[in-house]
């Protein structure tokens, strides 16, 4: 279910959290009803902003306590790629689709610094930080599909803390 949800819903949910406009699939894996489907989305942020302001915007919109930022804080970004969970495999697709920043989780140092050397900033919002919105989304869908069942959502609790 996890990967299926990543393809069918997670990307559009993350893009919606960030209010991306003019969206397209980041990494196509197939199609649904003749429409491209796949991992991640790429589109435009509501307005151009610095990388530092983008990082703060991501924290606020995704409701997470911290992000790791790779790139110059003053770099202006508008075109963003987002991929929930681990985004290491979509760096090339994000660059090919002219993303100025990739917002994802589980980004390792070497991949992130290589992306920056290639001209694209990276915001690592954490695997959990980019995917915990799944809980509420699936609960809402289940409430619609099986209204005769009580659906309880697990409490949101980040699995780690930073000292």
Task: Label each region the model flagged.
Residues 1-163:
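Hydrophobic structural segments
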């Amino acid at each position: 279910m996890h990967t299926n949800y990543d393809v069918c819903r997670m990307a559009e949910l993350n893009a919606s959290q960030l209010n991306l406009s003019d969206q397209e699939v980041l990494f196509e894996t197939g199609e649904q009803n003749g429409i491209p489907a796949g991992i991640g989305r790429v589109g435009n942020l509501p307005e151009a902003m610095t990388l530092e302001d983008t990082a703060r915007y991501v924290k606020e919109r995704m409701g997470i306590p911290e992000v790791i930022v790779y790139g110059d804080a003053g770099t202006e970004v508008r075109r963003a790629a987002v991929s929930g969970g681990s985004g290491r495999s979509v760096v090339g697709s994000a660059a090919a689709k002219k993303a100025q920043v990739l917002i994802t989780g589980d980004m390792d140092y070497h991949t992130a610094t290589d992306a920056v050397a290639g001209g694209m900033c990276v915001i690592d919002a954490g695997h959990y930080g980019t995917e915990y919105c799944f809980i509420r989304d699936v609960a809402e869908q289940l409430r619609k599909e099986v209204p005769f069942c009580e659906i309880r959502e697990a409490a949101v609790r980040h699995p780690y803390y930073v000292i």
